[in-house]
Each structure stands twice: as C-alpha cells, then as structure tokens.
Regions:
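Extracellular/periplasmic catalytic domains that process cell-envelope and extracellular macromolecules
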Residues: 45-49, 121-124
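Peptidoglycan-targeting cell-wall enzymes and recognition modules
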Residues: 8-30, 58-158
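N-terminal secretory targeting signals
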Residues: 1-8
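Short helix-to-loop capping/linker segments positioned immediately adjacent to catalytic or ligand/cofactor-binding
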Residues: 41-44, 116-118
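Solvent-exposed, polar/charged alpha-helical surfaces in well-ordered, non-transmembrane soluble domains
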Residues: 33, 37, 51-54
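Active-site-adjacent structural elements in enzyme catalytic domains
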Residues: 47-62
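A short alpha-helix/helix-coil micro-patch that ends at or immediately precedes a cysteine
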Residues: 34-42, 59
Length: 158
C-alpha cells in the first residue's frame, strides 16, 4: 500500500506524568510507567489514539478507581440499561434481590464465548477497559501472552 506508514514513520505521543495525574489523580508513577509500554505494544501512537484510549479507560473505570464491574443497579436502572436481557421490572427486582452474580450471569451469559453456567460472572468487566466475555478475555490473553481466559482475575492486575 502506497500510503501505509511503517512504525518508524509514526510520531510517538505520550501524555506527560502531570497530564496523567490530572486525569487519574488516584494513581502514581507506578501506574504511569506501566501504561507507557502498553501504548507501544498496541500501537497507540498518535495523540488522537492516546486521547481515545485514556478517555475510554477513564470512563469505564471511573478514573482507574473501579477495576471490577459493579452490579449495584436499582431494578429500574437494570431494566433501562439491559432491556434485551431483562424483560420486566419484576424480573429486574428478582435479579437485584439475588445479587451481583445473578445479574452478571443473566446480562453476560450465553454469548461471546460465555457458555458455562457462571461465565457471566466469571468474565464480568475488569481492568481499565472493563473487559467482558470469555472471547474477549481469550483474545486479550493471547495479545498479552497471559492466561486471562483461565485466570480472569489477572485482568485486575493489568
């Protein structure tokens, strides 16, 4: 391809530590230093791509403070957010009473590689991106050379 850029042709952009701290005040140098190699590994080179990644991580993890998905829904909110998976307010009320694991299994069960009973909870949102579903854990694990599909709690450490 005539217009394709090689990796060496791309300018590398990374936010300064001060910019990082402004966006993620609860973190420190350790997290910042862990973040920089990920930019290189996953070819997040440009300011636009870095900004998009940081915005996504910030939104999904409440500023890198929530590294595991909460299922603290009211029945009304559960029905509003997941109307395809939760069909009625009565069903939402039953799920909320049963707790977070039941909610996760209904919302995430039976799709994107989640096949076994309990997979919705097992492969719930974790990490800065709130990675969900077995298939995504397997893909991310392959990219990171980590056994995320068999040890999903490792995502919280990334």
């Amino acid at each position: 391809m005539a217009n394709a850029e090689s990796k060496s042709d791309r300018a590398f952009y990374a936010p300064s530590y001060e910019q990082w701290r402004a966006m993620f005040p609860q973190t420190g140098m350790l997290e910042y230093r862990a973040f920089l190699p990920a930019l290189v590994q996953f070819e997040i080179w440009t300011a636009d791509r870095v900004a998009a990644a940081l915005a996504q991580w910030s939104h999904e993890s409440r500023g890198l403070q929530a590294l595991e998905e909460s299922f603290a829904y009211t029945p009304e909110r559960l029905l509003a957010v997941f109307p395809v998976r939760v069909k009625s307010l009565a069903e939402a009320e039953r799920l909320v009473k049963r707790g977070p694991e039941a909610i996760a299994n209904v919302i995430y069960g039976g799709r994107f590689g989640n096949r076994a009973a309990g997979d919705g909870w097992r492969y719930r949102g974790r990490g800065p991106t709130q990675l969900t579903f077995y298939d995504n854990y397997a893909l991310a694990g392959a990219a990171l050379n980590m056994p995320l599909a068999t040890q999903p709690d490792l995502v919280k450490l990334i």
